[in-house]
């Protein structure tokens, strides 16, 4: 009987403790918790886990249609949480209320700096470096972002042990998509060689 009385808010606590906290990388965990706190729990937190319907989840998704990226991320969190609810015996198998709900199309989120913007940024970094108004590590980090195409977190957590000057690459052991090698061109190698160790 207890399992039928469990609310989505209570399920979310277990989901956090047994999945988010132990299986997700910190950035993803933070995003899952934010989605739960801001969108999912206010919408369906008081409902009984066993009673949540496809219509409830569709309503949550539809209310965020003006921000498709956010709506779709919430759908992913709900889907994972209810998959685990099935695994934990809180719902019958194959009853995930997210099933068959289609995601909204998303606009590509990539934006590249124009040649003029890149030139202006380069000049600003050079000025900041010459005038010593900015931390040299911050300037180097921005340059590495530009020259490598790495994610911000990959550069911010970069260690010297990941840098292979001989092979001209970064060997990143734990990125968002797993281990990967980033090949370094001359500008990136120059930036790295000028950083104090």
Predicted segments with their positions:
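N-terminal DNA-binding module of tyrosine recombinases/phage integrases
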Residues: 1-55
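Short, conserved phosphate-binding/catalytic loop or strand-edge motifs used
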Residues: 47-62, 97-102
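C-terminal flanking helix
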Residues: 37, 79-86
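C-terminal catalytic core of Y-nucleophile DNA break-rejoin enzymes
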Residues: 114, 174-194
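Short, intrinsically disordered, charge-balanced linker/junction segments flanking boundaries
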Residues: 1-4, 192-197
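Basic, Lys/Arg- and aromatic-enriched nucleic-acid-binding interface segment
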Residues: 68-77, 87-152, 156, 166, ...
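Short, basic/aromatic-rich helical patch in the C-terminal catalytic core of site-specific tyrosine
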Residues: 57, 78, 82, 155
């Amino acid at each position: 009987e207890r399992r039928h009385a469990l609310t989505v808010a209570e399920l979310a606590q277990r989901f956090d403790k047994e999945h988010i906290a132990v299986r997700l990388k910190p950035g993803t965990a933070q995003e899952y918790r934010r989605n739960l706190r801001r969108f999912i729990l206010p919408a369906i937190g008081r409902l009984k886990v066993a009673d949540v319907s496809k219509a409830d989840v569709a309503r949550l998704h539809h209310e965020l249609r003006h921000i498709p990226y956010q709506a779709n991320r919430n759908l992913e969190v709900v889907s994972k949480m209810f998959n685990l609810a099935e695994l934990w015996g809180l719902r019958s198998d194959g009853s995930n209320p997210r099933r068959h709900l289609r995601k909204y199309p998303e606009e590509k989120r990539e934006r590249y700096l124009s040649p003029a913007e890149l030139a202006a940024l380069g000049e600003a970094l050079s000025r900041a470096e010459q005038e010593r108004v900015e931390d040299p590590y911050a300037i180097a980090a921005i340059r590495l972002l530009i020259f490598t195409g790495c994610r911000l977190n990959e550069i911010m957590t970069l260690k010297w042990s990941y840098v292979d000057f001989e092979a001209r690459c970064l060997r990143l052991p734990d990125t968002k998509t797993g281990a990967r090698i980033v090949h370094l061109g001359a500008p990136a190698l120059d930036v790295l060689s000028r950083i104090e160790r």
